[in-house]
Amino acid sequence: MTMSNYQRQLFAKHQQLHALLRPFSAPKIRIYPSPEKHYRMRAEFRIWRDDEQLFYAMSRGGALTAQNIVRLHNFPPAYITIDRCMPLLLDALRADPVLHHKLYEVHFLASLRGELLVSLIYHRALTDEWTAAAKALAKRFHILLIGRSRKQKITLERDFILETLNVDGRAFHYHQYEQSFSQPNAYVCQKMLRWACAQAGENAGDLLELYCGNGNFTLPLASHFRRVLATEISKSSITALQENIFLNQTNNIAVARLSAEEFTQAWQKERDFYRLKQAGIELADYQFETVFVDPPRAGIDDNTLFLLQKFPKIIYISCNPHTLAANLQTLTQTHELCAAALFDQFPDTPHIECGVVLRKK
């Protein structure tokens, strides 16, 4: 059997990750593939004008110019509700001067539940006339709609979608906000959640989660621990997390608005934080058996790495295997790698999402 183009890409990613993890005596890497199309739950496009015609546009690389533009009517990598809506929405925008005048970008955000939120971004102020036309458009296409321009945002119904992810037979519900981070590939995200829960096992102790975002991992992992302390610095992410905790009726998660660096200072008693007292959090009450981290592409700072070395078990999700490998230089001084996985969140791109588990030697 010959390999498909997707299988070749995935094999190349596996080889790259294997080479990066080989110095740390990594076990066999489990591979979690993506559907080959209709996997992206969010997509953003420029609007391009050509002879009074409107097109969705992407760049072949670099700045968007007439020489490197890719004109689109639909986008097969996008989730089916986005892909089907794109050409119909474009026709409707073309036909209405109020809606297409100085329209600059269109952003789509979809959920497996079938909800679709569309953001229209303009280089002009939005008027009552625009609002009336936008309401008619939203009703016609059964979508949530937001209009944006400089210092202006008009939300016609709400600025988030409802998502439901299934993990080992249990449904977890999320508010996913426009302009806030959420996992772009819901199919692979569910595989990541199942893997993380399997690695967590059943624990009598507590979980520390750094960089928790909107609670994507927090909620499924909470059922595997006595208590969870989740930290995040973004106020908008914390708002979404608290809503999602309420939505799922989870009662063993405490939330601290701290960066990873600030938590390290608090844990090592280098600094007192009023935010912890305000939330009623006493760090001395926790018995952390596991720490879960999903850091930004830059990886984890040195002080936080030294903090992680104190915990028996580390589950590390990475969107940049190169910074993961750099962080493992420190973490494997005290821990050994006992599990590794590749999650293909981004087919047809060189990006690699991966996870590792480390146990104290």
UniProtKB/Swiss-Prot annotation:
HAMAP family according to UniProt = RNA_methyltr_TrmA
Report the catalytic activity.
uridine(54) in tRNA + S-adenosyl-L-methionine = 5-methyluridine(54) in tRNA + S-adenosyl-L-homocysteine + H(+); uridine(341) in tmRNA + S-adenosyl-L-methionine = 5-methyluridine(341) in tmRNA + S-adenosyl-L-homocysteine + H(+)
| Enzyme Commission code(s) on record | 2.1.1.-, 2.1.1.35
Q: Does the keyword tRNA processing apply?
A: yes
Supply the name of the protein: tRNA/tmRNA (uracil-C(5))-methyltransferase
List the active site: 319 (nucleophile), 353 (proton acceptor)
Provide a Gene Ontology MF annotation, just one.
rRNA binding
Name the encoding gene, please: trmA
List the taxonomic lineage: Bacteria, Pseudomonadati, Pseudomonadota, Gammaproteobacteria, Cardiobacteriales
A cellular component term from Gene Ontology for this protein is:
cytosol
